Amino acid sequence: MRNTVSTFQELKNKGEKITMLTAYDYSMAKLIDSSGINGILVGDSLGMVCLGYENTLSVTMEDMLHHTKAVVRGTSNALVVGDMPFMSYQTSIYDAVYNAGRFIKEAGAHAVKLEGGATVAEEIKAIVKAQIPVMGHIGLTPQSVNMFGGFKVQGKNEKVAKKLIEDAKILEEAGAFSIVLECIPEKLSKIISESISIPTIGIGAGKYCDGQILVYQDMLSMFSDFKPKFVKSFGNIGESIKDGVSQYIKEVKEVKFPEEKHAFKIDDDVINKLY
């Protein structure tokens, strides 16, 4: 049975942790979905881990729709959330609703995610009014990397911490069904999680969030450009891939692959007629 926004709320109410990962293509989505994950975020992080950009700012709506369609086709259990890219909702409320609608209508996503606190409250209200579930995102919001001066922990001083608590309450009031808390102190995320009734999903926000999310390339050691402090490696798939490719190259060079069992047969009398 497909997880829904109601599932997320039920899990929080029961005190059971919510599990999420990113996915960007059909085959990986199918693997992750079959593992029993609650939700999959098609993150604009694909700009960095799939497309090689320095940050997420260059990702377009077309990029996001293309990848979201693939992920939806690979799932039958997880709630699929489409990440609204930079400048797809900041320009106007109309654009926010229109582009959110494209994720649902064209890509088949079940919800969308927006970055920001009070500044995007009106956009969230309008999207929810259009019957589209919205996941909020506060703390380190990668689309604001130029304002932050880099990828840095947020909420370490009283002023910013209080602002994050207030933002979380505003997002709940605006109609968000959950909120991602990224790169904020663990004890602050505890206060936020206890201050609102909707689920919090942490990434670099400690154990007190109602759920956790990671970029799958990070948690499987497949992305070597950098490794955030908050990432734990749950499998060295990157090394396994390199080892497998190296072995493939070796066997092709030494004519050990393909073997007879990998080849298709043809009758000798047919072959003899070809000379």
Curated annotation (Swiss-Prot):
It catalyses: 3-methyl-2-oxobutanoate + (6R)-5,10-methylene-5,6,7,8-tetrahydrofolate + H2O = 2-dehydropantoate + (6S)-5,6,7,8-tetrahydrofolate. The keyword Cytoplasm applies. GO terms for biological process: pantothenate biosynthetic process. It holds the Pfam family Pantoate_transf. The active site is at 182 (proton acceptor). Coiled coil: none annotated. 3-methyl-2-oxobutanoate binds at residues 44-45, 83, 113. Its EC number is 2.1.2.11. Pathway: Cofactor biosynthesis; (R)-pantothenate biosynthesis; (R)-pantoate from 3-methyl-2-oxobutanoate: step 1/2. GO terms for molecular function: 3-methyl-2-oxobutanoate hydroxymethyltransferase activity; magnesium ion binding. It is found in: Cytoplasm. SUPFAM superfamilies: Phosphoenolpyruvate/pyruvate domain. GO terms for cellular component: cytoplasm. Mg(2+) binds at residues 44, 83, 115. Binds 1 Mg(2+) ion per subunit. Gene3D superfamilies: Phosphoenolpyruvate-binding domains. Homodecamer; pentamer of dimers. Belongs to the PanB family. Catalyzes the reversible reaction in which hydroxymethyl group from 5,10-methylenetetrahydrofolate is transferred onto alpha-ketoisovalerate to form ketopantoate. HAMAP family: PanB (MF_00156). This is 3-methyl-2-oxobutanoate hydroxymethyltransferase. It comes from Clostridium botulinum (strain ATCC 19397 / Type A). The gene is panB.
